């Protein structure tokens, strides 16, 4: 209640209920208490959910594969990489960071000691050949999808690529075939480079996998459309710069309109034939 300076103590006592507080803007009273109350009431399970900490044990060795190319930001790691490193450290495990070009040597030096390898999605094809089958392997993007509660939907969405691939095989050489429409969405508005994963690499991999020439639409930031009718598939980035509410809103929008939606890492893992392996750690450690 505001304007507490205008009411007496009896009025306050009669009108006070659970989780209520009296505030006076005039006298600056109760404002800090109000902020603390709002903070307590808005606690969500996101604050207790873990990116990777529930999948590893103290003392585990976790290798993080982070390619450094022209699309990587200068002088820093992107947010999911920072968050995974922090979560590994909070668990009491050890994070070893390397580029994909040094992964083979890193694994050789750590032979028999690595519990998990987390890779940037675009390096999946190379990394999968180097990581022993008895070592868990996943990606930052897949970890982010699980963290935001969207992994199940992302896995289902990735399998739409198989349907498109089948259509590509059936219509090979038939120019009358209708090109599928795919929306590729970025949560942030970074400056795109010549080898950008969302606008260059991912479309190229999809063309190669499906044998089709899909009609791609690219959006970023707040450009995500309200109406998704006409799209065969939505492929979203990991959404590290979007809060959980916004990501759920976008996922819900797709579900309400019966448009399958996946994310970069899940789609790339599926096209490389290692999606099942990328999910193995979740199926073994927790129920997704």
Identify the residue ranges that each predicted region occupies:
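Canonical P-loop GTPase G-domain recognition
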Residues: 1-54, 63, 92, 98-99, ...
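P-loop NTP-binding site
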Residues: 56, 60-288
